[in-house]
Amino acid sequence: MKQKGLRYDGSIDKYPITEGETYILDNGSKIAIADITLGLPEFSKKADCVFIDPAGNKGVLKAYYTKAEKECPVQSFDEFITYIKNCIEQINPDRLFVECFARNKNQIIPMVESLFPCVKIYNNTYYHSSKNECWIVQGSKRPEDWGLEGMDEWDAVFKICKEVPFNAITDFFLGQGLVAEAAYEAGKIFYGSDMNRNRLAVAISRIVKRGGKWTINK
């Protein structure tokens, strides 16, 4: 029996996504289970924009694996950052947005600087509270300012999906689907993956509530 809390809102009962399945929308958006230490889904590599909110330290990362009922294969947080960087290099996007916190800011910023010639750092908040400080680190091929300064990260994601030009956006830590919701509302394609099937089921459910219809490719 699974621990109470790991099932989130219970969407997994209605949308029991499993390894090897891809949930697909009419516009080509896709969601699948994937652990970045084992590789990205091929469809994720077609995105030209990336937004991710990775674990902030080794303890948080280990907790994510525990909630997904998996063993954490990463020995250090620096190793985790290397996996993230490798994924971004495979995608080779035009733009990258990484949400970070005080505990991982000093590792995220140098990573983005190593990937893009132009880096901008926005001061942001989360959970709509000024007490909750975070940053969105933006990497691009030329200087850009998308007006994200001071915004809550939730609102910033919706603004990015609405205003930033891209063919498809990917989030390989999709979780419960903020990027998917924002892209869907903006009428754009998203590619989402996460190692936790229960969290992905919530994302799938949220798109259904917005009118989306999924087909399953096994």
Question: What role is predicted for each listed range?
Answer:
Residues 1-218:
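Class I S-adenosyl-L-methionine-dependent methyltransferase catalytic core
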